[in-house]
A protein has these predicted regions:
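Short, basic/aromatic recognition patches
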Residues: 1-18
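Short capping/connector residues at structural and topological boundaries
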Residues: 35, 103-105, 120
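Charged phosphate-binding loop/patch that engages nucleotide di/tri-phosphates or the phosphate backbone
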Residues: 113-121
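Short, structured beta-strand-loop surface elements
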Residues: 29, 41, 49-113
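Short beta-strand segments
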Residues: 16-49
Length: 121
């Protein structure tokens, strides 16, 4: 994992209508909600994040955003990051990794890391 090109992430995210915010509850369960992230500087902001999402982020700051593709051959945009849920109006996420991901047309060689079609941003 290196530095995330937030400008590239914002550019790609503009082609999607919404994202899924994935958080972990204090009881170690996955919670998913539909969100409309915005990009401010080097931070991804999720305005109007639910109380549950903010509570989860306070307990487990590691979160993911997934923008699904319009069709099954398209790329999903996946952003992992560290969330700050202190603001009641929005969840702020510092991205730590971002990729475009889709199933590979042909599987890659075993042991080659991601055997899918992945593009680091």
């Amino acid at each position: 994992m290196g530095t995330v090109d937030i400008d590239a992430v914002a550019e790609h995210a503009g082609a999607y209508g919404f994202a899924y915010l994935i958080t972990i509850t204090p009881h170690q369960r996955v919670h998913t909600s539909v969100v409309h992230p915005e990009f401010t500087g080097h931070v991804v902001t999720v305005p109007g994040a639910s109380d549950r999402a903010r509570t989860n982020a306070a307990a487990h700051a590691d979160v993911s955003l997934v923008w699904p593709p319009a069709d099954e051959t398209g790329y999903s945009l996946i952003v992992d990051g560290i969330a700050d849920g202190q603001d009641a109006s929005a969840l702020r996420i510092a991205p730590s990794r971002a990729i475009l991901h889709r199933p590979a047309v042909e599987p890659g060689p075993a042991g080659a890391g991601c055997v899918q079609d992945c593009i680091e941003l």
